[in-house]
A protein has these predicted regions:
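A short, polar/charged loop-to-alpha-helix boundary motif
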Residues: 356-374
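Beta1-alpha1 glycine-rich phosphate/pyrophosphate-binding loop at the start
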Residues: 1-67, 151-172
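Mid-to-C-terminal Rossmann-like scaffold of FAD/NAD(P)H-dependent oxidoreductases
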Residues: 2-3, 262-360, 386-400, 405, ...
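Rossmann-like dinucleotide-binding cores of NAD(P)H-dependent redox enzymes
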Residues: 135, 145-199, 276, 294-305, ...
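Glycine-rich Rossmann-fold phosphate-binding loop(s) that bind the pyrophosphate
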Residues: 8-11, 34, 121, 139-144
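Local cysteine-cluster metal-coordination motifs and their immediate loop/turn environment
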Residues: 397-411, 427-447
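FAD-site-proximal beta/loop scaffold in flavoenzymes
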Residues: 113-134, 202-207, 211-278, 371, ...
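FAD-binding core/adjacent interface of flavoenzyme oxidoreductases
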Residues: 1, 60-137, 207-209, 220-223, ...
């Protein structure tokens, strides 16, 4: 089992190689990447688009592997155990990991195509969008669509966000949360067309099903992704929404695994970075001889949009459950809203809008499956004495940075070693360099203010 070939060079593949080496794998690892860039954190593309970060800061650390860029794997010969590429090369493997990711699902709109229609998936996409001038329409009001609209607004564009559902981020937010998000975006300057679909594109204008016309020299599609399964299909591996894997992240061929956006586990192909990283961690441990199992990922989503503090935990369905205790705090005058769904004193779902102090506490309680404090209001308001999930009150093994699996103990050790600011802690531990959602938590832990621009530019390099 010395030769491992990884098809794909995104965050999941990079994390896998890092963890394999950390577990002591000394064999040959070959990585085949389609893009021209070395591995980078695509989760933060929105921050590049709004100029908070530069493209260089998204680069992930160099790994100990033979990395091939600008190559596409075209065929798996399972009998000979080799992967063929479009360059004509063959790469033999003892174990093969498919981390092929996903591709944007572009809408078919009469009159729209070519340079007028753009996805936001790669650094190259980011550069093309960044070079555009004039009004922009964003299709899709999910997480990526909201982040893209906010980023484009920050660049000075006139932005219209078109979403077919009545409220934004409908997979993560309830009606109230979606309405508050729409109000906040509207106040910032984003034009919203909710409950509408684009039906045509004519002379620089997007025509909606309401007959409204939206000016758009460029249309950015944030309308979902499709798992890249073609290689697996050609190899005869079972594929549904993604490449089907078991709890050991194996396909029907015991020598072939799949992780990340391309994988379907237990009927789910989440497309979330947290799932990709947890799968990479689990697979690395398994390939190193461990006996772990991947059982799914607890979903915590934090919007990365300048000036908006919003997090969603679990499924929106949990918030509407009739057999759960639901705690709601609404403060419309200050643009704040919180909703918790509890079952047996544990958090099963949450929406937190405008409560940055509570996000860390609620996330930790959810992650660790801990009972919530009796004083629910104190939890939401972030009252330190009543919040066992606050960073300073957490046990040493609590994970502060989910993206890079950085514990409070590791951060404390780095702080004692001289890393006294958020950027210094980022360099020492890589905390905050994933999705950026733990910046405030790390800042509170070290008693330093969190400057998001400074921490990410220095920490993610």
């Amino acid at each position: 089992m010395n030769r491992i070939v990884v098809v794909g060079n995104g965050p999941a593949a990079h994390r896998l190689v890092e963890r394999l080496r950390a577990h002591g794998h000394a064999g040959r690892i070959t990585v085949l990447g389609r893009e021209e860039h070395p591995a980078y954190n695509r989760v933060l593309l929105g921050a590049v688009l709004d100029r908070t970060l530069t493209p260089a800061t998204l680069a992930l650390p160099i790994v100990d592997a033979e990395v091939h860029l600008r190559v596409t794997a075209t065929e798996i010969d399972r009998t000979r155990r080799v992967v063929r590429t479009d360059t004509g090369d063959e790469h033999p493997y003892d174990l093969l990991v498919l981390a092929t990711g996903s591709r944007p699902r572009l809408p078919e709109i009469p009159g729209l195509g070519g340079e007028r229609l753009q996805a936001l998936r790669t650094l190259a996409d980011c550069a093309r969008i960044g070079s555009a001038a004039g009004p922009v329409a964003v299709l899709g009001g999910g997480i990526l669509g909201v982040e893209a609209a906010r980023a484009l607004l920050a660049r000075g564009h006139e932005v219209t966000l078109v979403h077919p559902n009545p409220h934004l981020m409908d997979r993560q937010l309830d009606d109230v949360g979606g309405r508050l998000l729409a109000e906040r975006l509207g106040k910032l300057g984003v034009e919203l067309r909710l409950g509408r679909r684009a039906v045509a594109y004519r002379r620089g204008r997007l025509v909606l099903d309401s007959s409204d016309v939206v000016p758009a020299g460029l249309v950015v599609a944030c309308t979902g992704v499709t798992a890249e399964t073609g290689l697996a299909v050609r190899a005869g591996l079972p594929v549904r929404r993604g490449i089907v894997v078991d709890d050991r992240l194996r396909t029907s061929d015991a020598r072939i695994h799949a992780i990340g956006d391309c994988a379907e586990h237990d009927g789910e192909a989440s497309g979330l970075i947290a799932s990709a990283w947890e799968q990479a961690d689990a697979l690395a441990e398994l390939l190193a001889g461990g006996d772990t199992r991947y059982r799914g990922t607890r979903t915590v989503t934090r919007l990365k949009a300048r000036g908006i503090d919003l997090a969603s935990i679990g499924s929106v369905d949990c918030l509407e459950s009739t057999d759960a205790e639901v705690v709601t705090l609404s403060d419309p005058a200050r643009g704040r809203y919180a909703k918790l769904a509890l079952r047996e004193e544990r958090i099963t779902g949450a929406v937190l809008f405008g409560f940055p102090e509570a996000i860390a506490a609620v996330s930790q309680l959810h992650d660790r499956d801990l009972p919530v404090p009796t004083d629910r209001l104190a939890l939401l308001l972030g009252t330190p004495a009543a919040v066992p999930g606050a960073p300073a009150e957490l046990p040493d093994d609590a994970v502060i940075c989910r993206c890079n699996n950085v514990t409070k103990k590791a951060l404390t050790a780095a702080w004692r070693g001289g890393a006294r600011s958020v950027p210094e802690l980022a360099r020492a531990t890589r905390a905050t360099t994933g999705c950026g959602g733990c910046v405030d938590d790390v800042g509170r832990l070290c008693g330093a203010p969190a400057d998001r621009t400074e921490h990410q530019e220095e920490g993610a390099a």
